[in-house]
């Protein structure tokens, strides 16, 4: 593994807590999880980490989860409205949003688990997800470049990434259970550390 499960959980909870404070929906916030997660990995682990986005498919204990749009020609694409983001770092695929999957889709009963796999173990196609934990990603570079460019125009994105990196501490170091931040009006707000507990790994 690139990072310990305890540190993965901490990164997920830090980002999740900031999203809740911003009233963003953590279940559809993969851009935040991937961008802030990559920033934390680069800052604290000194690894080259890149957020990627596009089509993503998972076999989660026999439950298939697909982030994609169905095209008129019958194929699926990750360049449309239904896309997903993940992190690629040192040959690993890490999805910091995986513990939020129970909230990501109504009626999806999957436990909150870590997703951290070698990229070399990725299935060869979307149709080859036979075992639990199997995954398939297809990065849509052009579509995601446009999405990220539009998204980064929001001034708070860089601030939140810095707050996330400042809040995170590698285990076994103590991490603050809450932090205080100033909102756009200069008012101080307390953000508690929040998120699902992990139930193992995919």
Question: Could you describe each region identified by the protein language model?
Answer:
Residues 1-202:
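A structural boundary/capping signal
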